[in-house]
C-alpha cells in the first residue's frame, strides 16, 4: 500500500509514561486506561493508518503485552496499518509496544530496545562467618535461594540469572 497515493484518514495517538498501575495518585499506562483511546484511534473516521507515538521506559510486562495485543487485535479487525514512532524512549515494555507496529520509526537519538532485567545484591558471607552467625534457609528445589546475600555466588548461579 502506498500511503501517499490517495486521500486517506490517519489517526494519531500517544502512549506516554510508565506502563502499569502506579497507584492511587499516579496514572501509568494500563489496558484499562488505554483501551478506549486505542479503540477510538482505530475507528474514528475509519483510518487506513494509525500512528502511535511512544515515549515509555517500560514497566509491567503483563500490561505491556495486554496493550500490545489490543493494538494488534484492533489493527487486524479494522484492516488498519500501524506506524509506531519512538519519541525519547521506547525501552523494555515500551519497546514491546513499539513492536506492535507494521512500520517502526525512531529518531537516531531515541533510546530503543529491550534493556533487560537488573538484579543487584550484596555479599555478607565473610561478615557473618566472622561474627559467628549461623543462618538457616529452607527451600524446596535446587538453588532456590541463589540470590541470598549471605551465600557465595557461583558461575552457574550467574548463568541462571542472565
Locations of the language-model features?
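Small-residue-centered hinge/linker elements
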Residues: 1-80, 89-162
